[in-house]
Amino acid sequence: MPPLTAPQPATAAHGEVIKAGHVTLDIARLVADIGQGPVPLTRLEFLLLRELAEHPGHSVSKGRLLAAVWGYDFDPGSNVVDVCIRRIRSKLGFELIKTVRGEGYQLVS
């Protein structure tokens, strides 16, 4: 009888990446790379950046980011998206994510 092993958490396929512009996102490791080595991100930072990377060249509204990352509807008084964007910019560079006034945010390619 084979030995019992603890179930392993489900993860993305080994080596699965998303590339958008200068950014490469490693799905399994939750890291981003802009050509200077991997930068670890929190889960929420990674999910937000992934949402932007899946729409390269297009602005993504705060409402869409809130729904995709946090799972709730847009609250005009919430600054959670702004704070997360600021943290990503501080880790990966301020020029990476463009603020599109009146629309949302865009990953610069």
Residue ranges and their predicted role:
Residues 1-19:
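Basic, amphipathic DNA-recognition helix from helix-turn-helix-like DNA-binding domains
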Residues 12, 18, 41-43, 92, ...:
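A generic fold-level signal
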Residues 18-46, 106-109:
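A structural micro-motif at secondary-structure boundaries
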Residues 21, 56, 103:
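Glycine/small-residue-rich pyrophosphate-binding loop that anchors the diphosphate of NDP-sugar donors
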Residues 27, 62, 102:
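Catalytic-loop Lys-Pro-X-Asn motif of eukaryotic-like protein kinases
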Residues 31-43, 47-84, 90-95:
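Positively charged, aromatic-enriched patches within helix-turn-helix-type DNA-binding elements
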Residues 96-109:
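A short linear beta-strand->loop->alpha-helix hinge motif most characteristic
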